[in-house]
Amino acid sequence: MVFKPLTIAAAIAGLTPFVSAFDAQAKSNVAVYYGQGYGQQRLSHFCQETSLDIINIGFINTFPDQGAAGWPGSNFGNQCDGLTYEVDGVSTKLLSGCHQIAEDIPICQAAGKKVLLSLGGASPDNQQILSDASAVRFADFLWGAFGPQTEEWVSNDGPRPFGEVVVDGFDFDIEHNGGFGYATMVNRFRELFALVPERTFYISGAPQCPIPDPQLSDAIAQSPFDFVWVQFYNTAGCAASDSINGVSTGFNFDDWVDVIKRGANPDAKLYVGLPAGPGAAGAGYYLTPEEVYPLVDVYMNLYPETFGGIMLWEATASDENTFSGLTFADVIKDILVAVDPSPPVPSPSSSSVIASSTPVASSTPVASSAPASSTPISSGSPVPSSSAVSSSPAVSSTTESSSTQVVSGSVSASSSPITSSPVASSTPVASSAPSATSSAVASSSPIAPSSPVASSSAIASSSAIASSSAIASSSAIASSSAIASSSAIASSSAIASSSAIASSSAIASSSAIASSSAIASSSAIASSSAIASSSPVAPSSPVASSSPAVSSSAIVSSTPAVSTPVASSIPVISSPAIASGSAIASSSHVASSSTPAASSSPAVSSSPVASSSPALSSSPSASASSTPIIPSSTASSAVVSSSPTPSSSVVRSSSLLSSSSPALSSTRTPSNPVIPSSSAISITPSSTPVRSTSSVAPGKSSSAPVIPKPSSTVIATFTSSSGSLPSSSAPAGSGVPSSSTLPHPSSTSLLSSSPVSSAEPVSSSSAVGTSVGSSSNVVTGVSTRSSSSVVPSGTPIPPVSGTATESVTSSSSGSGSPTVPSSINTSSTDASSSSSASSVEPTSSGSVITSVTSSSASRVSSSSSSVVITNPSVPSDSSSSSGSELSTTSSTESTSSASSQTGAPTTSVSLGSSEAASTSTSGAAASGSGAQDSTKPTDHASTLSPSYSTPLASASGQTGSPTTVPAGIPTGNGSGLAPITSSITSAQAVPSVTSSGLESEPEPTITTTVIVTSYIDICPEGFTTITTTYTTTYCPATVSATATATAAVTNPPGAPAQTTSPSVPEGWTTTVTVCTHCAPTPTTVTLTLPATNRPSALASSTSAPNSPEDWTTTVSVCTDCGPTPTTVTVTIPVGAATGVDALTASPSGSQPAGESSPGQSAPTAPASTAPTTTETVIVVPSQSSTSQPVILGTGSVRASSTFHIQPSQSGSRVPVAPSGTAAGVSPVFTGAASRVSRLQHGAGAVSAFALFLLAAI
């Protein structure tokens, strides 16, 4: 069995929680059993809980001495598909298809949890070891099957039910037939553990509370156990409930301490085993949290060296037993931590400073020093300065109760770097000496917040600037300041400079940064004024800091700095949610341009041009750190005020740039991303002082939330332009402000307009929309440089917006009113100004490329999105030049090809998972007609969908009819039907002509039709996505047909993609086997496409004129879905057309779900008189970690060779459906909850699936 390493790595990257190192010696650990809960969720769901430290997966419930063929058997409830191994024709009880568990165990381990495999359970009751030799063989078998994989085991075809996944040890929950052999097994395990000294493995046991326990007392005395969690329930006279009921001879924890001290390992930790809910044990044995607290308080303090924590039976019972939104395990963890006088300090993630391997040398020294003073500058001449600050401190997360020092590294990447170090004080930092360094500077300072930081240090200068000289400010602050806090930091600081330039680097971070080592923004774009903004964030309690960070120099820039990407050899992931808002104002009181959380002071800016440009670091992969920051709900509001202020100074802003050219990286390592929780950035235009408040929703009291809901962050830019000057300039003393206000506070979402660095007045600013969909969004934003590029009124601007659960699509029209679906998240606001600047000349086209890469987070499907937007410059008459180039930036290997013709800006979006955002507008159509809305809002709570980047998206821009082709199949794990995408696109805009007459072509015409169909089955355990490509090739003249069904889908790992090639004279039939984990017998769907007669136009193929010439195009796809790549060969003749017959089909573009149904032909490319190129889009998603792999085709169901063990060469072993198991689902039993009524499964899951499948067909 070979599980895809990229799939597991992506899932781990998306679900890395607030990791603290596991401490086996802690007194506050929580252990829980998993695998036997009724209707239990996937293991990954419980990995999200920070309260859980140890998870026992149960059970290996059949022992070799009682098992078929001498093999053990397993039962993990609803988490396996029912297939078992077969030995020499004998079906064993060892499950072979437990893909979900195999996918989820590494995620739990990456979250700092230990996963043990439990032996025993309450059923069956014949479990027994008959000899020491049998005990040794049993231990060796389990070590080979579930321990580290060895070549010897694989070469002998040994079973690996979990693939290459390795458990962290073994648990003994022995309920029957005495204790013989278990000490031998434990000692044998210890010998095997010693073979892998680089990894720690554990042994645990769950005896019942009577002393001595008939099953495990001997093993505890004779072999070393690490943990002993006694079942203090279901047995009267020793249960924990006896201590509550006042039974003097009851709760015998003291006696068990003596058993431990006399055992083979006197240092073993003793846990109190409790039921996790009223129904998890017999009546009267459940303890409420109020009853647990005094018990823990007494015994933890009485036996601090032996008390280890609490064991719970079982995970699903805890999950369903909630208290104000907290599970029972959460509450128990809170109790343990509260009582524990010295809880273990979590180990922070790697805090190494990663400097760029290609430092940018300084080319222009700083011509003047900027003293750290708040004195306003009154001068008649500008102060020349040319510096750019790229501050990127790398931080890592700390818990609420610790103050771990975090090393931050800043890399200067500009024409004249100035290192801005974050300091833990209120002293502003500024450069006071010329700097011409060419080395990357890594500064470090401790950032140790130990409580939620609600810093609302919006610093405003109260001194006016009496400057009468023209000041051209071009400040670009490439700040990706990461705040290390266990909860969200509402705001870094909004700083208003008291100098003539109010370029105040307002870093309104709406979510904390989850990067143990950040790389500075790859380029400082045309930044000529550096604000050494160093507002410290080092509070140990809630802080309302008001320390000024003031730059008091008037800055004039004459030479823009050349932006040079910093190629980092060690890529990291920085936060996608840093909105670096720079306010450019003239001489007036300048308040905070970004009002952070809890700030209610009015934001009054004298400059109506206040662009909020996100400072986003682009890095496609993460460093190998292991500690993310999981903030609580955070919101920050950037308030843009346009209240005019009389001023005699002229301010020309050349535009703030998103200082995030792609930080090129050549390696990809496991990431530890940020998982923002409900972060939202709203930018509100206003013509009066605005009171902005932000709500900070803290996480639960026990610890930071691990897997929050997907957040939605849309950052827009407000551009005001009514005259030749962007500022509110007016004759001195006139008191009459110019009319450069924000006329359309909520118009079309403006992605970008080209910035200007020339001396001409301009009202243009750039903003890069960012889509925060999951844990580690990497947004690359590049604004091309041109002169005086202003988008006139009425020109549709393609917006980019996206959320993880809801999509935001805005189709712009001439009226400037946005089109927003009803499912838009209220925390996501798309707004921009669509006013025109009458005195600005149109310039050459500029393109903005935004690449969005989303890793997966729990319950957040991941995707690799490549968004390519061409925004040609348009003169005032809304016409655009043709031939605009499209370029694509994608952190993963996603390909987009498009052809943009006159007046047709084309958007090609390659989307997967639950993110969907695409909009096409026609530049030539003033009313925006022809825009095609293909956004599919998906609100599925999916479980760990891996990141995939296989879609090939092809879009053709036709005259007046733009086309949007989203390629990819969203996945989800909800109760609704996930979108099903079928798409076929062509690159020609020739109308199709449907012919109903007979075709008289003497030469046969070959047509290739590709149907992309996705079937999704929904079961309580998860869902499976199957995408099968059917290709049929036939000659209309002979009406003969052959068909091949290429099963490039999610197969069981290691199993080759199966292909069936029926050849039927009258048609073809393909059989698909799906959802083997919902029923013992595979469900068969038969799709029949009969051969069509030529008189029938509806089923006819596209006919092209005969020609001896032809050409062939070969497309290879899905190299990671099977052992060999799938090749599709398309052969199309070329010649002069005499007639065109077309299939009846939907227009080129996105085909809604369910339209590619049996008996309906897929659309094909229309032909033309010129040589026609038909591009076939084959959408083949990689295996989703949320789905149960399925075998397609008519071949026999067979796993890879690693599924089987062959003691002799004569037997063949194939996984078969178990016999005697109702509905193909393993029976549910209570396991460690001994002698309690067993839970039973029904056939509801199978019925639901069958009904759904029939409806889908």
From Swiss-Prot:
**PROSITE patterns noted in UniProt:** GH18_1, GH18_2
GO annotations of cellular component type: extracellular region; plasma membrane; side of membrane
**What is its induction?**
Highly expressed in germinated conidia. Expression is induced by tunicamycin and DTT.
Biological process terms from the Gene Ontology for this record are:
chitin catabolic process; polysaccharide catabolic process
Residue numbers covered by the propeptide annotation in the UniProt entry = 1232-1257
Q: Where in the cell is it found?
A: Cell membrane; Secreted, Cell wall
> Pfam families in the record, alphabetically?
Glyco_hydro_18 (PF00704)
GO: which molecular function terms? chitin binding; endochitinase activity
- The protein's predominant localisation is membrane
Record's superkingdom?
Answer: Eukaryota
Q: Where is this region: Disordered?
A: 364-429, 595-980, 1141-1174
Sorted alphabetically, which keywords does the UniProt record give? Carbohydrate metabolism, Cell membrane, Cell wall, Chitin degradation, Chitin-binding, Glycoprotein, Glycosidase, GPI-anchor, Hydrolase, Lipoprotein, Membrane, Polysaccharide degradation, Secreted, Signal
Please indicate if the UniProt record lists Flavoprotein as a keyword: no
Q: Where is the composition biased (Polar residues)?
A: 700-715, 940-964, 1145-1154
EC numbers on record: 3.2.1.14
Asked if the record carries the keyword Magnesium, the reply is: no
Which reaction does this chain catalyze? Random endo-hydrolysis of N-acetyl-beta-D-glucosaminide (1->4)-beta-linkages in chitin and chitodextrins
**Where do we find GPI-anchor amidated glycine lipid attachment?**
1231
UniProt xrefs under Gene3D superfamilies: Glycosidases (3.20.20.80)
Q: How is the protein altered post-translationally, as described in the entry?
A: O-glycosylated.
Q: Which residues form the active site?
A: 175
Q: How does it sit in the membrane?
A: Lipid-anchor; GPI-anchor
Q: Where is the composition biased (Low complexity)?
A: 595-696, 716-935, 1156-1174
Of which family is this protein a member? Belongs to the glycosyl hydrolase 18 family. Chitinase class III subfamily.
Give the protein's biological function. GPI-anchored chitinase involved in the degradation of chitin, a component of the cell walls of fungi and exoskeletal elements of some animals (including worms and arthropods). Required to reshape the cell wall at the sites where cell wall remodeling and/or cell wall maturation actively take place such as sites of conidia formation.
The protein depicted here goes by the name: Endochitinase A
Q: Which organism is it from?
A: Aspergillus niger (strain ATCC MYA-4892 / CBS 513.88 / FGSC A1513)
Name the gene behind this protein.
Answer: ctcA
